[in-house]
Amino acid sequence: MNETNHSRVTEFVLLGLSSSRELQPFLFLTFSLLYLAILLGNFLIILTVTSDSRLHTPMYFLLANLSFIDVCVASFATPKMIADFLVERKTISFDACLAQIFFVHLFTGSEMVLLVSMAYDRYVAICKPLHYMTVMSRRVCVVLVLISWFVGFIHTTSQLAFTVNLPFCGPNKVDSFFCDLPLVTKLACIDTYVVSLLIVADSGFLSLSSFLLLVVSYTVILVTVRNRSSASMAKARSTLTAHITVVTLFFGPCIFIYVWPFSSYSVDKVLAVFYTIFTLILNPVIYTLRNKEVKAAMSKLKSRYLKPSQVSVVIRNVLFLETK
């Protein structure tokens, strides 16, 4: 009987961000701090929104959900990448690789749809302010969040369906710090040209359609407020600037990686770091530094849990223990 298959690949080797041993400690420290900043920044937003009744509005409800998804996006691969900086051979099992593919498309797909929901929320708030609380009821907000997760699940299931049955029997080196779908499919033992086209079509449709909806929403808002007072125009511009910045930083790398046909591995690797790490750090900064309500709520939260009298007592106790 002839052997019909080569030995099946049971693990993949991740080449990581850099092959330089000298850079590994620096990269370990840098990305550990960045990941910690992502967790602290986004969990702070979630805590602030949930603890302050003044922020129990549709906009901040969606913002808190965005922060939660940002934590998920940062956590699907970053801890593994940080741990890999400490080892020479960076491997990941076949099942764990598929899990990374599943989660990255689930979370990023959900975030794209949620950003569209946030743009719709701003459209209703600015263009139809008298009907805002009726249109953006709590039930509608919950439905919008559930839709974002549902679309993300459908998107990632369809993407994973292209990969799970591919035969992997030869090369197993992935030139990235996580199992990126386009890179993994190219390692299959068969011609994956059609599969690659389906992957691009799936990701491209979700990315481009979401991005176009966002562009249309923001354009309508800007046209609507153009003839209003300078004060309302300034407030609308401030809000839109924050949203547009987040959208550009998130969608730009995703569209370039999955839609642009002339990208290279080195460029894709940098862009992957951008939308899985750097953008997620900027989101809390962008949304809080430009928002007086969030900053006021954070100050109130700090005064509640970090009272000067309590801090001084802790300091005195520490000094007393040190002098004993």
Curated annotation (Swiss-Prot):
SUPFAM superfamilies with a match to the protein in the record: Family A G protein-coupled receptor-like (SSF81321)
Q: Which domain of life is it from?
A: Eukaryota
Q: Which residues lie on this side of the membrane: Cytoplasmic?
A: 50-57, 121-139, 220-235, 290-324
As for subcellular location, the record says: Cell membrane
Residues spanning the membrane: 26-49, 58-79, 101-120, 140-158, 196-219, 236-258, 270-289
Disulfide cysteine pairs (residue numbers): C97-C189
Q: Which residues are glycosylated?
A: N2, N5
- This protein's record includes keyword Cell membrane: yes
The UniProt GO MF terms for this protein read: G protein-coupled receptor activity; olfactory receptor activity
Topology, Extracellular side: 1-25, 80-100, 159-195, 259-269
Its record classes its membrane topology as: Multi-pass membrane protein
Q: One GO cellular component term, please give it.
A: plasma membrane
Q: Which CDD domains match?
A: 7tmA_OR4-like
Matching entries from PROSITE patterns are given as: G_PROTEIN_RECEP_F1_1 (PS00237), G_PROTEIN_RECEP_F1_2 (PS50262)
What keywords is this UniProt entry annotated with? Cell membrane, Disulfide bond, G-protein coupled receptor, Glycoprotein, Membrane, Olfaction, Receptor, Sensory transduction, Transducer, Transmembrane, Transmembrane helix
Where does it mainly reside? membrane
Main function: Odorant receptor.
Note the PANTHER family from the entry.
OLFACTORY RECEPTOR (PTHR48002)
The family classification in the record reads: Belongs to the G-protein coupled receptor 1 family.
Name this polypeptide is given:
Olfactory receptor 4K15
Native source species: Homo sapiens
**What taxonomic ancestry is recorded?**
Eukaryota, Metazoa, Chordata, Craniata, Vertebrata
What gene makes this protein? OR4K15
